[in-house]
Amino acid sequence: MESSALLTAGVLFLFVAVVAVPIAARLGIGAVLGYLIAGIAIGPWGLGFIRDVEAILHFSELGVVFLMFIIGLELNPGKLWTLRRSIFGVGAAQVGLSALILGGALYLTDFSWQSALIGGVGLAMSSTAMALQLMREKGMNRNESGQLGFSVLLFQDLAVIPALALIPILAGVQGDFGDWERIGLKVAAFLGMLIGGRYLVRPLFRFIAASGVREVFTAAALLLVLGSALFMEALGLSMALGTFIAGILLAESEYRHELEIAIEPFKGLLLGLFFISVGMALNLGILYTHIVKIMIAVLVLVAVKGAVLYFLARINRMRRSERLQFAGVLSQGGEFAFVLFSAAASFNVLKGEQLPLLLVTVTLSMMTTPLLMQVIDRVLARRYNVQDVPDEKPYVEDDEPQVIVVGFGRFGQVISRLLMANKMRITVLERDISAVSLMRSYGYKVYYGDATELELLRSAGADKARSIVITCNAPEDTMEIVHLCQQHFPNLEILARARGRVEAHELLQTGVRHFSRETFSSALELGRKTLVTLGMHPHQAMRAQQHFRRLDMRMLRELMPQLTGDVAQISRVKEARRELEDIFQREMLRERRRPSVWDEDDE
């Protein structure tokens, strides 16, 4: 593509993302499906704004590459070792069973045994990008279904390598000694990457970090990710696997969090571009010509993979509440199918219309997953919330609660227990289905659902409740719920959990007066006890704690971020901190002159 055409395409991608994704979110069909529909609209079979789909699809695979790097950063070799049984046990079983059934189905049509074999293996692969994105949206990455799903995806990434090597053999291409020599060189280069990454990358980042220039650190992070991907592609291996390994090698380094922050914005945009390009690749001409055959193929693909995954979840004793999510989120075809099928077509293993038919089937199966996950959410909500009610009724009981608590993790549990101990009527909403099932077994009335959905809040009684307490892990979810409540339930008193000062500032800017920084109070309490152990009288330590809390809150409000630049903001922070330290010292000096009337035992 020429530079002007590339710039035009970039602007077009940003425009459709900005327009389509919010509309999709408002319609409740999810961001991923919004990207796919946007891709269909601007692609060669839609409005025709973009023609060179293959080049864009190849470039957009970098979204998956960045995603796998960040996932690698979140693991370490020890944690990966603990997943070995699920990777090579459940992962291998999923690929083997799915490939056997789907390949057999292809063989019963007009596919040869060679094309049926490679077709079955390709269809057995799931979309790493889509599955991981949906897992994060649904909060599955924190429970058993998410961990097992990740293990299956990782095995699929590994399985692509021998599958690609199998294609020339199926095509009848004879190898020679030179082929084995090249394979040996690739293995040696791969081992060299592992050793170099282990012993050279960390000192390199230490040298770069010492410069203190953030832009150079970001450039180095991009160089590491893109360099690893390019190196693995040159070896004929998976780019995503290479960056995943690079992430694991740095998972225990002191630069892990900085790397994650540097890469995150690129990952999000490129993943969106990947889904748009998948939508553009959908051949509507083939779909129109063979619509019945393709629809049956999509149905069989999703049903077979879903059934295999559900069976594996059951024999691995996964909680009943998580099996459907596990089966649904991996039920689609994946991006590696494009690679496998294109390679097979180049060796003439796939012939005629077999390639476009398979590609359209995979693309449509990817479009079914967001909708399927919504159906599963509804099924789980009805199963684990209200029992034996007509379908038209809401799936959360409106008990006319005084308080709605969003999130039932450790933070939300403490709040809920305190409220229930004081006979308050509460409704608890939780998105993690395993937590809902577990807490209901202990007698807690917890409902499954995503509180960022307006109808769920309305069903839970938000229009009648006096307060809502938001304890979400994700700050973006907290802010979305805050905006929903302010817009649709203005009489609802909002109380929220803030993970730190940044989230606290965001809440203050939206007008939320009551919030708690999750580590602030416990840190103050431990600080007070430390003062007592150092010899300060318990009364003075308590007063010091109270003064510090009040003054820190004052500083938090005074230092609200303004559009004055980083240097001005830093200057304001330093000046305010000095001023508040002076005030604190004067107030504590007055406190020391007051008589002490109680000691530590009076608490």
From Swiss-Prot:
Similarity-based family: Belongs to the monovalent cation:proton antiporter 2 (CPA2) transporter (TC 2.A.37) family. KefB subfamily.
InterPro entries according to UniProt: Cation/H_exchanger_TM, K/H_exchanger, K_H_efflux_KefB, Na+/solute_symporter_sf, NAD(P)-bd_dom_sf, RCK_N
Membrane topology listed for this record: Multi-pass membrane protein
Subunit structure: Interacts with the regulatory subunit KefG.
Location (main, coarse): membrane
Domain spans labelled RCK N-terminal: 400-521
Keywords: Antiport, Cell inner membrane, Cell membrane, Ion transport, Membrane, Potassium, Potassium transport, Transmembrane, Transmembrane helix, Transport
GO terms assigned for molecular function: glutathione-regulated potassium exporter activity
Name of the coding gene: kefB
Gene Ontology BP terms: proton transmembrane transport
TM region(s), chain numbering: 5-25, 29-49, 53-73, 87-107, 115-135, 152-172, 180-202, 207-227, 230-250, 268-288, 291-311, 326-346, 356-376
Function: Pore-forming subunit of a potassium efflux system that confers protection against electrophiles. Catalyzes K(+)/H(+) antiport.
GO cellular component terms attached to this protein's record: plasma membrane
Disulfide-linked positions: none
Protein name listed in UniProt: Glutathione-regulated potassium-efflux system protein KefB
Domain of life: Bacteria
This protein's record includes keyword Cell inner membrane: yes
Subcellular localization(s) per the UniProt record: Cell inner membrane
